[in-house]
From Swiss-Prot:
Annotated Zn(2+) binding sites: H139, H143, E220
TM ranges: 4-24, 33-53, 154-174, 195-215
Domain of life: Bacteria
Cofactor annotation: Zn(2+)
UniProt remark on cofactor binding: Binds 1 zinc ion per subunit.
EC class: hydrolase
PANTHER family: PROTEASE HTPX
Keywords tagged on the record: Cell inner membrane, Cell membrane, Hydrolase, Membrane, Metal-binding, Metalloprotease, Protease, Transmembrane, Transmembrane helix, Zinc
EC number(s) from the headed UniProt entry: 3.4.24.-
Subcellular location: Cell inner membrane
Protein name (record): Protease HtpX
Keyword Protease: yes
UniProt organism field: Shewanella sediminis (strain HAW-EB3)
Predominant subcellular localization, coarse grouping: membrane
Length: 287
């Protein structure tokens, strides 16, 4: 309920601020409501469609093999560990899968707490100790228990709405300015206007990515804390330390990467979906 209230309040705030700014700039606000509805439909529509098909998409893009019947003791232990942690966290047992990759990584995805998937790479499953893997699994189960998939989808929907709305409002201001200084009053013209909107979509999109990445980093710290409760602080730290010593992870689709245990490094930390492993380890030790 709080999450939905925050969502509505944020969108109302966007509309209010935009209306005030448009009034100050002398822009006709009679169509602002329609534009916001348009932006929200496409902004949230894309985010929620992505969430709804997240499990299916993960299985297809990552080549995940869901474990229905364990083939060996390692797979049996993996399923039993996830089942135990899910019970501790009070959620329905997620599907458990393995995807073939030499990297040390894992991720959680799914539209809800009771309809989720936890997947680990073959490199992680056969390259880390059971204590380290237990820490990784606890982190992913915590993502599911915390409702992070839905939370970040709502945040993504808000920023998508902002990007679509703001880009077209600013393009409208530019068009009106050009029109007022044009003897024929024609403005930018359709193709030039579309070009301006495209550039603004890109610029605002970068800002939006930074906002989503910021909230993603916060959720990573929370998932680490939850992982420490489910497995133990020592196992969680051991898992992160092992990841820190390993090679940088390879490419993973953005939606899965946001809930992976190990994110890609970036020159600018503000663009990273995961905090640096050193900071995560330090936060756990200080807790």
């Amino acid at each position: 309920m709080k999450r939905i209230f925050l969502l509505i309040a944020t969108n109302m705030a966007i509309l209010l601020v935009a209306s005030i700014v448009m009034s100050i700039l002398g822009v006709n606000t009679s169509t602002m409501g329609g534009l916001l509805v348009f932006a929200a439909i496409f902004g949230f529509g894309g985010a929620f469609i992505s969430l709804a098909i997240s499990k299916w998409m993960a299985k297809k893009t990552m080549g995940c093999e869901v474990i229905t019947t364990p083939r060996d003791n390692t797979e049996r232990w993996l399923v039993e560990t996830v089942a135990r942690q899910a019970e501790q966290a009070g959620i329905k047992m997620p599907e458990v899968a393995i995807y073939q990759s030499p990297e040390l990584n894992a991720f959680a995805t799914g539209p809800s707490k009771d309809n989720s998937l936890v997947a680990v790479s073959s490199g992680l499953l056969y390259g880390m100790s059971q204590d380290e893997i237990e820490g990784v699994l606890a982190h992913e189960v915590s993502h599911v228990a915390n409702g992070d998939m839905v939370t970040l989808t709502l945040i993504q929907g808000v920023v998508n709405t902002f990007v679509i709305f703001a880009a077209r409002v600013v393009a409208g201001i530019i068009n009106n300015f050009v029109s007022s200084n044009d003897e024929e009053g024609e403005g930018l013209g359709m193709f030039a206007y579309m070009g301006v909107v495209f550039v603004l979509d890109m610029l605002f999109g970068i800002l939006a990515s930074m906002i989503v990445a910021y909230f993603s980093r916060i959720r990573e710290f929370k998932a680490d804390e939850g992982g420490a409760r489910l497995a133990s602080k020592e196992k969680m730290i051991a898992a992160l330390d092992r990841l820190r010593q390993g090679p940088e992870t390879g490419a993973m689709p953005a939606q899965m990467a946001a809930f992976g245990i190990n994110g890609k490094k970036s020159m600018a930390e503000m663009m990273m979906s995961h905090p640096p492993l050193e900071k995560r380890i330090a936060a756990l030790r200080a807790s």
